[in-house]
Swiss-Prot record:
This is Mitochondrial adenyl nucleotide antiporter SLC25A23. Belongs to the mitochondrial carrier (TC 2.A.29) family. The chain crosses the membrane at residues 188-205, 243-262, 286-299, 336-355, 379-396, 436-455. Ca(2+) 2 binds at D89, N91, D93, H95, E100. CDD domains: EFh. Residues 39-61 are annotated as: Disordered. It comes from Mus musculus (Mouse). The gene is Slc25a23. Residues 149-158 are annotated as: Linker region.
Length: 467
């Protein structure tokens, strides 16, 4: 092993560490001693490190770890750390320097500055050589909560928890371990349930947005309170949830199709590469989103028609589909498809770019202390990036909605995407392309909050472990 430690020396070192942690000297290290010891030694997050140690080697966590169990864990741990050290030591000179740290992050799609790489190195460099040798690496990570450099990406994974009613974002990344253990589908299910609850909770604002996109104009100055009042007067309070059923129903097929398409497209783009760069993720995510939208798009048209329906206009989902087919033909199910697909590029691109920018800014400022930014930072960055994506793609979303609703407006002109854009700009100006954006923004915070709470509870119910 690099570093020249004999087996006897390693066991002596492990024994000394065990004695440090065993504060009551009963020959076992229990959960409380482990937590207190890790906090005292400054070895990362005590909760997560303690979970990793006890889950690996002790059948009875309450009983604590014996010296033998603790030694077995550290032996296996050092072997994994040595493999990680070798993978980061690109030139195999026995030391990790600043440039190798930058290369490792770059391979994961994260761009960090020289100053930030030096901060990371300083946190482990005890002898002031501006490099990290095996002993420094081992001692820093032996009981540290991070398994590898990719844990930084785990914390920053753009999660399905942020469901704000639009499915145009780049899909989530799942590790090989998550795929092999089946955690990936549990996380997708948790995300789908969270999305369903979130969309149901914010359905009145979503219906108001669609209502204002289609009906608001210079001559019909529809505001938020006026729109809600009109809908309640026409169909009662429950009418505020019209169209929500199919909006929830389409979550599962769209998420599944997008995930499968993303994995296949990633494989084709990646080739022999280990990881995808941010630009490649954007291309793969956009193509996967376009694939999913192409397949489920008839459900989008049905959602718009059902959302805008008058009381008694349709008996239900199947009746709506039947009437559209009979009166307008199969092409009606793809009305507005072009602006919808074109909207994926600005939405997913800006969403991903803003998220990566915020992530890199956080890493440059704070990651020398911890790779985990905390849930408030994650939710804040996700909300800001999604909102920026929405602003950029909103005019196309409005044109799409109006085209989907064309046949449901009596005497409404059947115009193309370009024709509709020209009509809106000439009659209402640029602001006309942003009708309904106020209720759209109003639903972002409650949607994100609801989906996060439900997502975390669903993960717990399904047995999804957090690293």
């Amino acid at each position: 092993m690099r570093g020249g430690s004999s087996d006897a020396e390693r066991r002596q070192r492990w024994g000394r560490l065990f004695e440090e942690l065993d504060s009551n000297k009963d020959g076992r290290v229990d959960v409380h001693e482990l937590r207190q010891g890790l906090a005292r030694l400054g070895r990362g997050d005590p909760d997560r490190a303690q979970q990793g140690v006890s889950s690996d080697w002790d059948a009875d966590p309450d009983g604590g770890l014996s010296l033998e169990e603790f030694t077995r864990y550290l032996q296996e741990r050092e072997q994994r750390l040595l493999l990680m050290f070798h993978s980061l030591d690109r030139n195999q000179d026995g030391h990790i320097d600043v440039s190798e740290i930058q290369q490792s992050f770059r391979a994961l799609g994260i761009s960090i500055s020289l100053e930030q790489a030096e901060k990371i190195l300083h946190s482990m460099d005890r002898d002031g050589t501006m490099t990290i040798d095996w002993q420094e690496w081992r001692d820093h990570f032996l009981l540290h909560s991070l398994e590898n450099v990719e844990d930084v990406l785990y914390f920053w994974k753009h999660s399905t928890v942020l469901d704000i009613g639009e499915c145009l974002t780049v899909p989530d990344e799942f590790s090989q371990e998550e795929k092999l253990t089946g955690m990936w589908w549990k996380q997708l299910v948790a995300g789908a349930v969270a999305g369903a609850v979130s969309r149901t909770g914010t359905a009145p604002l979503d219906r108001l947005k669609v209502f204002m996109q289609v009906h608001a104009s210079k001559s019909n100055r529809l505001n938020i309170l006026g729109g809600l009042r009109n809908m309640i007067q026409e169909g009662g309070v429950l009418s505020l949830w019209r169209g929500n059923g199919i909006n929830v129903l389409k979550i599962a097929p769209e998420s599944a199709i997008k995930f499968m398409a993303y994995e296949q497209i990633k494989r084709a783009i990646r080739g022999q590469q280990e990881t995808l760069h941010v630009q490649e993720r954007f291309v793969a995510g956009s193509l996967a989103g376009a694939t999913a939208q192409t397949i489920i798009y008839p459900m989008e048209v049905l959602k718009t028609r059902l959302t805008l329906r008058r009381t008694g206009q349709y008996k239900g989902l199947l009746d709506c589909a039947k009437r559209i087919l009979e009166r307008e033909g199969p092409r009606a199910f793809y009305r507005g498809y072009l602006p919808n697909v074109l909207g994926i590029i600005p939405y997913a691109g800006i969403d991903l770019a803003v998220y990566e920018t915020l992530k890199n800014r956080w890493l440059q400022q704070y990651s020398h202390e911890s790779a985990n930014p905390g849930i408030l930072v994650l939710l804040g960055c996700g909300t800001i990036s999604s909102t920026c994506g929405q602003i950029a793609s909103y005019p196309l979303a409005l044109v799409r909605t109006r085209m989907q609703a064309q046949a449901s407006i009596e005497g409404g002109p059947q115009v193309s995407m370009v024709g509709l854009l020209r009509h809106i700009l000439s009659q209402e100006g640029v602001w006309g392309l942003y009708r309904g954006i106020a209720p759209n923004f109003m639903k972002v915070i409650p949607a994100v909050s609801i989906s996060y709470v439900v997502y975390e509870n669903m993960k717990q119910a399904l047995g999804v472990t957090s690293r």
